[in-house]
C-alpha cells in the first residue's frame, strides 16, 4: 500500500519548511524549455552564463534564470 502525504516539496515550492521564491528545474527540464541539448545547458552552467545550484551530484536552475536568459539573448538578424 502506498502512502501519500500530499504534494512534494518541489511541487509546492517549499524547501525544508520555507517557501521558495522560484521553482527549481532540472538540467533536462531546462534543455526542453530552451530546445537545446543537456550538454548545452551544462556548458552554460559551467561557463557561468546560467546560474545554477548544486544539489548532490546534479544541478538545479531557477526558472527565473532561464526566463531571464531567454529574454535577454535575442539576436537581431536585420
Curated annotation (Swiss-Prot):
Q: What residue ranges does this record give for the DNA-binding region?
A: 24-45
SUPFAM superfamilies membership? Putative DNA-binding domain
Query: Which GO molecular-function terms appear in the entry?
Result: DNA binding
For this UniProt record, give its keywords in alphabetical order, as a comma-separated list. DNA-binding
Q: Which InterPro entries match?
A: DNA-bd_dom_put_sf, HTH_17, SinI_DNA-bd
Name the chain's protein. Putative DNA-binding protein MT0521
Origin organism lineage: Bacteria, Bacillati, Actinomycetota, Actinomycetes, Mycobacteriales
